[in-house]
Amino acid sequence: YAAWQVSLVVATLMAVTGFVWLKWMISRSLTAGERYDVRDGDPQPKTGGLPHPATGLIPLAAVLGVAFVLHDSLKQSALIVALLAGVLTVLVVNRKYFINLPHAVSNGTLGALIAIANTAAVVGFGAIAKLSPAFGAAVDSLTSLPGDPLVSASIAVTLIAGLTGSASGGQAIALPLLAPHYLGLGVDANALHRVVAIASGGLDSLPHNGYVVTTIRGVCRETHKSAYWPMFCMTVLVPLFGLIVALLLL
């Protein structure tokens, strides 16, 4: 719940900004005569017999509820249990809509393995980069920046997350190095936590990010050249805008 008021404002602002920007990009493309490509192997959409849209909220509520209840006892493992609860809830609520359950499980497992491999490779790269002398020199330079400590902390975390290609990986590497320094300067722990959480979601989704690679190459079967720009706008520019707003509010 650290600085939750700022988090709520920033999250709402980012969601609205991203939605409006994405709608504008789609409208501009349609006006220019662009259309979606149809490829062999694309899933065929169903027009009837779909579950009620409200049932999509039930698994989300299950994830949030289980994570909230088990957070104190299981710590980070609570997220894994919560996601499993969400998957099982989808299965129970929409059981009659599954046509080929083994096929769905097979595709889901394959997608999960690809995502794990991509993310592990990128985070592993970041862990190796952490051991280099240049990384230590970069951290020293970032922590010695003049001005507001929250600003220098946000810059440091953003750049480290960009180097590792992972928000969580960037936090895992940055916090043990940066938190003692900034807390020693008297920075409020709640404000530091919120800034770090938001800052790690900026440059983390550069082209080498595991999620970006999986989404563009694996899921959409596109190239970075044709598909990365909209993703860059939504996952880099919008979060950086949210970070600036958070710093102004804090």
Residue positions per predicted region:
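Small-residue-rich segments of transmembrane alpha-helices in multi-pass membrane proteins
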Residues: 40-42, 110-124, 175-186, 235-240
